[in-house]
């Protein structure tokens, strides 16, 4: 999509997120969500891309690097005895490939494909509690997405931390347990 003039920018990303949310209303594979979203973003900006271009964009997801603090922070959390389970809105094969290529160390994951829905629906959390036999009181949810993670985990009364990497304003009515700029901040409160 870069070749077509669409790159991650302050103008494109908010449009992408809004259109992606529309595509996630009804469950379909995340690859299809990405493909359809890419086509809509391009159209929104008056750029023509082919179905193949949109499919290539969707296929590129596993190559996207994690935030630089993520691998080390996950490793440190494991060293401290915390179980690290990813709740993700992507397809299982995409997440497996991302974990492998990024060298992430996790104890498990639950994907939209596993539950047949996308966060902020509660399917990920229901499966998490059933599969890992853990109570809400012993769960700490860490995420960057207010809409997909912080609001629903707060609604479920799960302690959480918003990783506010882009210094966004706190939306009205949202009250995360903690706010940090990155995962290193999180490590300061978890012993």
Label each region the model flagged:
Residues 1-71, 79, 93:
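N-terminal helical cap/lid subdomain that shapes the substrate entry/recognition surface
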Residues 39, 48-49, 58, 71, ...:
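Asp-based, Mg2+/Mn2+-dependent phosphohydrolase catalytic module
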């Amino acid at each position: 999509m870069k070749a077509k003039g669409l790159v991650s920018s302050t103008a494109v990303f908010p449009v992408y997120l809004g259109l992606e949310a529309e595509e996630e209303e009804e469950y379909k594979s995340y690859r299809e969500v990405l493909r359809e979203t890419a086509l809509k973003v391009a159209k929104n900006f008056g750029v023509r891309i082919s179905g193949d271009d949109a499919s290539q964009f969707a296929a590129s997801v596993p190559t996207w690097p994690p935030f630089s603090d993520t691998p080390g922070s996950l490793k440190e959390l494991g060293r401290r005895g915390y179980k690290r389970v990813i709740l993700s809105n992507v397809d299982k094969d995409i997440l497996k490939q991302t974990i492998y290529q990024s060298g992430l160390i996790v104890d498990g994951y639950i994907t939209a494909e596993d539950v047949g829905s996308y966060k902020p629906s509660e399917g990920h959390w229901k499966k998490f509690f059933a599969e890992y036999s853990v109570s809400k009181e012993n769960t700490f949810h860490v995420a960057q997405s207010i809409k997909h993670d912080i609001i629903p985990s707060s609604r479920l009364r799960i302690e959480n931390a918003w990783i506010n990497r882009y210094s966004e304003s706190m939306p009205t009515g949202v009250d995360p347990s903690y706010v940090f700029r990155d995962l290193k901040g999180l490590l300061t409160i978890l012993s």
